[in-house]
Swiss-Prot record:
PROSITE patterns in UniProt: KH_TYPE_1, S1
Magnesium among keywords: yes
Domain of life: Bacteria
A GO term, aspect molecular function: RNA binding
Quaternary structure and partners: Component of the RNA degradosome, which is a multiprotein complex involved in RNA processing and mRNA degradation.
Record: residues binding Mg(2+): D488, D494
Main localization category: cytoplasm
PANTHER family hit by this protein: POLYRIBONUCLEOTIDE NUCLEOTIDYLTRANSFERASE, POLYRIBONUCLEOTIDE NUCLEOTIDYLTRANSFERASE 1, MITOCHONDRIAL
Keywords attached to this entry: Cytoplasm, Magnesium, Metal-binding, Nucleotidyltransferase, RNA-binding, Transferase
Lineage: Bacteria, Pseudomonadati, Pseudomonadota, Gammaproteobacteria, Alteromonadales
Enzyme Commission number, as recorded: 2.7.7.8
Name the UniProt record assigns to this protein: Polyribonucleotide nucleotidyltransferase
Reactions catalysed according to its record: RNA(n+1) + phosphate = RNA(n) + a ribonucleoside 5'-diphosphate
Length: 704
C-alpha cells in the first residue's frame, strides 16, 4: 500500500469554510494543493525548472486555468465530447491569478515556472476564482520555489451600503459591486472590479475591506508552509557588476536623458536605440567577451532610473506634460457610413476606431459554463493589430491580453447599458486599436460610449476611462494622469478607472511595489476623477446623448403580443408556418413563451406584412362576422371552407343557396373563393358557416 501523508489546514472565511490539503494528490509536482471553498474544489499544481535556460532575458511564468465539465456533472458538447481550447472566462481567470503572483518572484529569477489550476468540483453558488487564487498562493508558498508570498485573495460585494465578503452568485445579483482584490500581509497588489457608478470612497473602502479580511488566508498559508517545511531552492540573484554599471552610466546616462526629452514616440525610440547601441559597441570593443544580455539588462535599468528620476525631480514628463495633464483629444462620432454606429477616439498617440452593430435576440452570445448557461446580449471585442505600434506580427485569433482588455472595457460600459425591455437588441462592439501609446483599453471605453450613442442605443450616460500611473522613491511620489506606454512599464503602479460623472464603473489596479498606502490610492483616484470629467466634457461636445433613432441600416425590432396558446399556430407543424413567414416577408421573427413576438427587419413594409399575417393566424373566429373564404374540400353533405389561416368551417349543403341543392359540386369547386358568415362555434371549436346568410338579400318586389 502506498503511504501518503496528508497535511490539511481549514479555516472560516466569510460565509464559507476553506480547506487546503497537500500530500495526497499529484505528489510528483513541486507542490500540489487541493483547495476547497464549500463544495467548490480546485487542484493547483506548481512545477519549476531547477536550471535557467542560457541567454533568457525574461521570466517564463505560465498560468493555466481549466474548468472541467465533470466538476458540474456535465458532459461537454461538440463532436469530440471533451474540453477544448480555453474559454474567454478561463483566460480571464488565468490572467487574474497571473497578475498578483508575477511581481512576487524575485528580480533576476528567470527559471521556467508553470502553475496549473484545475476546477474539479463546483457549487453553482460559489465561483472558483477566489479559491483558485488562494490555492495558487498556497502551492507556490510550499513549493520551495523562490516566492515572496504568501498572497491572499477576496471578492467584495456591496449591498444596501454594506460590504459583503466573498458573496455568493445569488448575492451578486443584487450587489452594486463585484471587486476582486489580492495582496500580501502588508500590500495590495491587484484589484479588478465592476460597479454601478459608485463613488471613489466606496471603491477605495472595498479595496481596504477586502485586504483586511484576507489576512486570515495569509496566516493559514503561513501555518501550512511551516508544517510542510520544504527547503527553499538554493538560488541567489545574479551579482551585479558595479564596475560595469558605472561604465554604462558614463556612456549612456546623458544620451538617454536627452533622448527622453523627445516628445514623438517613434523618434524617441529611435534615439534611445542609437544611445544603447553606441554604449554596447563601446563596451564590446573594450571586452569582446562581455555578456550582452547583462549589458542590455543594465541599460534597461539605467533607462528606468533616468525616466523615474526626472519625474520625481519635478521635471516635465516624457512628452512634456505636467503630472495631471491629459494628452490632446480628438473625438468624432459617425465616421463610417454603413455601420450602425461608429466613433474615432484619439488621445495623443493612442487611437481607437470603434463600431457598434445591432442585432436581434438570436444574435446574443449563448454561454454554457460550469456555473450554468446564460445569454450575453452585450459583447465587446478588442483587437490590437501590430501596426498600431509600428511593428509587423501575427494576425489571427485574439491573445490573452486582447481578451483581458476587451473584458475591462466591457465592465466599464456594462453598468450604463439599457435592459432588454428598454432596448430589445443584441449589441456587439468592436474596438480596433489603430494607434497605441498607453491605455488603449480606456480609449476603447471612450470610443464605445460614443459609438453606442451614435447607434441610438439609450445608454444611461456617457462613460470615459483613464489610465493612471505612479512613481515612488522613498517617501516621494508622483501620480501621473493618462500614462504613456513607457510610463506604464517604468512606473510602480498602473491603474485604470472607467466611470461616469457620478461614479466608477470599472477599476483595474496592478501595484508592483510595497508601501502604496490608502492615502496614495485616494490621491490617485481623485486625480483620475478630474481627468475623467475633462474627457467627458470633450466627448459630450461630439455627441452629448444618444441619437433619437437607430441607423437606417440596422434591423428595426417591433414587438407585439399574442395569446400564448396561439404560439403553436404561428410556429406551425414542424415550424412550417414561421419558416414560410420569415422567408416570404424577409423578416426575423422571435417568439417568447409569454406570447411576446419580436419582428426584426430594416424594411418597414416587410414588418407590417409580417404583423398582418401573424394577426390573421392568431385571430379568433367571431360569430356573426362575414369572411372571404376558400373552399378546400367538398363532401356529400357540404363543403369545408378556410376562413383564417389554419381555421376551417363547414358550410352544410342546406346553407349553400336559397334553393334546394342536390349536388354540392354543381355549386362549388375546390379553390373557389366564397363569402361565408359564421353562424356558430361549438364547445369543441367546430365552426358552422353559411353562404346563404352571407349573400346579399334580393330586394323585395315593389308594391303594386
Amino acid at each position: 500500500m502506498v503511504h501518503v501523508n496528508p497535511i490539511v489546514k481549514s479555516f472560516e472565511y466569510g460565509q464559507h469554510t476553506v480547506t487546503l490539503e497537500t500530500g495526497v494528490i499529484a505528489r510528483q509536482a513541486d507542490a500540489a494543493v487541493l483547495a476547497s471553498m464549500g463544495d467548490t474544489t480546485v487542484l493547483v499544481t506548481v512545477v519549476g525548472k531547477k536550471f535557467e535556460e542560457p541567454g533568457r532575458d525574461f521570466f517564463p511564468l505560465t498560468v493555466n486555468y481549466q474548468e472541467k465539465t465533470y466538476a458540474a456533472g456535465k458532459i461537454p458538447g461538440g463532436f469530440f465530447k471533451r474540453e477544448g481550447r480555453p474559454s474567454e472566462g478561463e483566460t480571464l481567470t488565468a490572467r487574474l491569478i497571473d497578475r498578483p503572483i508575477r511581481p512576487l518572484f524575485p528580480n533576476g529569477f528567470k527559471n521556467e515556472v508553470q502553475v496549473i489550476i484545475t476546477v474539479v468540483s463546483v457549487d453553482p453558488e460559489i465561483s472558483p476564482e477566489v479559491i483558485s487564487m488562494i490555492g495558487t498562493s498556497a502551492a507556490l508558498s510550499i513549493s520551495g520555489i523562490p516566492f515572496n508570498g504568501p498572497l491572499g485573495s477576496a471578492r467584495v460585494g456591496y449591498v444596501n451600503g454594506e460590504y459583503i465578503l466573498n458573496p455568493t452568485v445569488s448575492q451578486l445579483v443584487d450587489s452594486q459591486l463585484e471587486l476582486s482584490v489580492a495582496g500580501t500581509d502588508s500590500a495590495v497588489l491587484m484589484v479588478e472590479s465592476e460597479a454601478s457608478a459608485l463613488p471613489e470612497e466606496v471603491m477605495l473602502g472595498a479595496v481596504v475591506y477586502g485586504h483586511d479580511q484576507q489576512q486570515v488566508v495569509i496566516q493559514a498559508i503561513k501555518e501550512l508552509q511551516a508544517e510542510v517545511n520544504k527547503p527553499v531552492w538554493d538560488w541567489a540573484a545574479p551579482v551585479q557588476d558595479e564596475t560595469l554599471v558605472a561604465k554604462i552610466k558614463d556612456l549612456a546616462e546623458a544620451g538617454l536623458t536627452e533622448a527622453y526629452q523627445i516628445e514623438v514616440k517613434q523618434d524617441r525610440y529611435a534615439q534611445v536605440g542609437v544611445v544603447k547601441n553606441a554604449a554596447k559597441e563601446a563596451l564590446l570593443a573594450e571586452n569582446p567577451d562581455a555578456n550582452t544580455r547583462e549589458i542590455d539588462g543594465l541599460l534597461g535599468s539605467l533607462e528606468k532610473k533616468v525616466v523615474r528620476g526626472r519625474i520625481i525631480a519635478g521635471n516635465p514628463r516624457i512628452d512634456g506634460r505636467e503630472p495631471d495633464m491629459v494628452r490632446a483629444l480628438n473625438v468624432m462620432a459617425g465616421v463610417l457610413p454603413r455601420t450602425h454606429g461608429s466613433s474615432l477616439f484619439t488621445r495623443g498617440e493612442t487611437q481607437a476606431l470603434v463600431t457598434c452593430t445591432l442585432g436581434t435576440e438570436r444574435d446574443a452570445q449563448k454561454i454554457d459554463s460550469i456555473m450554468g448557461e446564460y445569454t450575453n446580449r452585450f459583447m465587446l471585442h478588442y483587437n490590437f493589430p501590430p501596426y498600431s505600434v509600428g511593428e509587423t506580427g501575427m494576425v489571427g485569433s485574439p491573445k490573452r491580453r486582447e481578451i483581458g482588455h476587451g473584458k475591462l472595457a466591457w465592465r466599464g460600459i456594462n453598468a450604463v447599458m439599457p435592459t432588454a425591455e428598454e432596448f430589445p437588441y443584441s449589441v456587439r462592439i468592436v474596438s480596433e486599436i489603430t494607434e497605441s501609446n498607453g491605455s488603449s483599453s480606456m480609449a476603447s471605453v471612450c470610443g464605445t460610449s460614443l459609438a453606442l450613442m451614435d447607434a441610438g442605443v439609450p445608454i444611461k450616460t456617457s462613460v470615459a476611462g483613464i489610465a493612471m500611473g505612479l512613481v515612488k522613491e522613498g517617501d516621494d511620489f508622483v501620480v501621473l494622469s493618462d500614462i504613456l506606454g513607457d510610463e506604464d512599464h517604468l512606473g510602480d503602479m498602473d491603474f485604470k478607472v472607467a466611470g461616469t460623472r457620478d461614479g466608477i464603473t470599472a477599476l483595474q489596479m496592478d501595484i508592483k511595489i510595497e508601501g502604496i498606502t490608502k492615502e496614495i490610492m485616494q490621491i490617485a483616484l481623485q486625480q483620475a476623477y478630474g481627468a475623467r470629467v475633462h474627457i467627458l466634457n470633450v466627448m459630450d461636445q461630439a455627441i452629448g446623448s444618444h441619437r433619437g433613432d437607430i441607423s437606417e441600416h440596422a434591423p428595426r425590432i417591433t414587438t407585439i403580443k399574442i395569446n400564448p396558446e396561439k404560439i403553436r399556430d404561428v410556429i406551425g407543424k414542424g415550424g412550417a408556418t414561421i419558416r414560410a413567414l420569415t422567408e416570404e416577408t424577409g423578416t426575423t421573427i422571435e417568439l417568447d413563451d409569454d406570447g411576446t413576438v419580436k419582428i426584426a427587419s430594416s424594411n418597414g413594409e416587410a414588418t407590417k406584412e409580417a404583423i398582418r399575417r401573424i394577426e390573421e393566424i392568431t385571430a379568433e373566429v367571431e360569430v356573426g362576422t362575414v369572411y372571404n373564404g376558400k373552399v378546400v374540400r367538398i363532401v356529400d353533405f357540404g363543403a369545408f371552407v378556410t376562413i383564417l389561416p389554419g381555421k376551417d368551417g363547414l358550410v352544410h349543403i342546406s346553407q349553400i343557396a336559397e334553393e334546394r341543392v342536390a349536388n354540392v359540386s354543381d355549386y362549388l369547386e375546390v379553390g373557389q373563393e366564397v363569402k361565408v358568415k359564421v353562424m356558430e362555434v361549438d364547445r369543441q371549436g367546430r365552426v358552422r358557416l353559411s353562404m346563404k346568410e352571407a349573400a346579399p338579400k334580393a330586394d323585395a318586389p315593389a308594391a303594386e
